[in-house]
Amino acid sequence: MERKEQMAITEGLLFVAGDEGIYPEQIAKVLEIEEEDVIKIVEEMQEKWEGEGRGLQIVQFAKAYRLATKKEHAPYYQKLMDTPTAASLSQAALETLAIVAYRQPITRMEMEEIRGVKTERALQTLVSHLLIKEVGRAEGPGRPILYGTTKEFLDTFGLQTLDDLPALSEENEQMNEADLFFDSLQELSK
């Protein structure tokens, strides 16, 4: 196997190993080479990556190698983390989020009755964005999951508590809850 391919496979192994990292002896076993050769390969990769000015580096922690971002780029990564999650949500996810916010705890079936369409994908998106979570189980057949909002939901939308959600007036009850929710959010951000 050529050195270039060994480096490529090592890079892939580092990626797959994630935060836990991978030990030189594990890489050696996979590549069917000596551990000393792995150490040389990693050193060559570190040197090459540094020379190319790449955003990732290989670090060794507790004898395991792992990929890490460069400290000098931390302000840029923080900007990504500070970006509001709502910007990346689909209209369906936003509508579902509004329903959960106002009607929690609520089951998926109840959400689907309100929206008139399936909400499974929207729910998965909201859970993955940590905006909603399972808060219990409803009584009845199948004991369906109950969903509610999270602290991240409050933080994302600048709310202290759920009581800060704009009240639904009787005249607005006919209006789409999602539209009401976002109109209210615009008022809060003024």
UniProtKB/Swiss-Prot annotation:
GO-annotated cellular components: cytoplasm
SUPFAM superfamilies the UniProt entry points to: Winged helix' DNA-binding domain
Keywords per UniProt: Cell cycle, Cell division, Chromosome partition, Cytoplasm
Main location: cytoplasm
Annotated GO biological process: cell division; chromosome separation; DNA replication
InterPro entries (UniProt xref): ScpB_csome_segregation, WH-like_DNA-bd_sf, WH_DNA-bd_sf
Superkingdom to which the source organism belongs: Bacteria
Localization terms from the record: Cytoplasm
Family label: Belongs to the ScpB family.
Subunit details: Homodimer. Homodimerization may be required to stabilize the binding of ScpA to the Smc head domains. Component of a cohesin-like complex composed of ScpA, ScpB and the Smc homodimer, in which ScpA and ScpB bind to the head domain of Smc. The presence of the three proteins is required for the association of the complex with DNA.
Physiological role: Participates in chromosomal partition during cell division. May act via the formation of a condensin-like complex containing Smc and ScpA that pull DNA away from mid-cell into both cell halves.
Name of the protein described by the UniProt record: Segregation and condensation protein B
Species in which this protein is naturally found: Bacillus cytotoxicus (strain DSM 22905 / CIP 110041 / 391-98 / NVH 391-98)
Gene responsible for this protein: scpB
